[in-house]
Amino acid sequence: MQTYLNPVLLAYGTIIIIIKIICFAGNTLVKVLENGKEVEKEIKDVKKDEMVLVRNGKEKRYAKVIDNKTTKGDFEFYIVKAKHLKDPSKTKEVTITPEHIMITFDEKKEIKLLPAKDLKGNEIIDTEDGFHQIYEISKTKLKNKYMLSVKGGVVFANGIFISTICSGDNARDLKPTLEEWKKLQRE
């Protein structure tokens, strides 16, 4: 096993990303396994060792929560709203910090990783029920932000397929790893 700059590891050709983030609002919903059943839980209530719904390539699976900590204070967040491409009455939204990396797709369905602060408001994102287009981005202030560390680097938050990587978290060191991660998502 070859070790890269902490906290990124490359093992047997598979990328394992264990990254601490401080990017989600506490009321963001993730799906966890409880007694063999999938239930929604607010990020602020997710505990270490719980299993959260993630994606590896196109396969949905569960990954272990490594840590979940609260940072108190006043923080800027972006509220990102998106509507379903085929049924605009279906909408989703997520509240994240400006540096939080969004997984977006261009017109050729190529993956582009963008911090929330760089979104233009027309990007395509993937969700549990198909592709959505971002139609509104607004700012808000919240008291706490939540650091959720998960294996795999992605999660479904409020049903949106989103990274668990903030551009401020050793982003310079992660660039090669993110390129490899993007390749895995196409497989």
Show the residue positions of the predicted features.
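HINT/intein-family self-processing domains that catalyze protein splicing or autoproteolytic maturation
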Residues: 5-187
